Swiss-Prot record:
NCBIfam families: rpmF_bact. This is Large ribosomal subunit protein bL32. GO terms for biological process: translation. The keyword Ribosomal protein applies. One of its GO terms (molecular function) is structural constituent of ribosome. InterPro entries: Ribosomal_bL32 (IPR002677), Ribosomal_bL32_bact (IPR044957), Ribosomal_zn-bd (IPR011332).
Amino acid sequence: MAVPKRKMSRSNTRHRRSQWKAAVPTLVSCERCQEPKLQHIACPSCGTYNKRQVLEV
């Protein structure tokens, strides 16, 4: 197994880890109630998905 030959500096460690972050979820507005919702998921406020009522709210 590979072993580091030298200690990695705090700056280099943080610089490498700066790219390792969570992506912000994309929000779209609901076609029926105009509330923000996640893509490809039923609207939590009105219960519609793809112009159909799928949840009882």
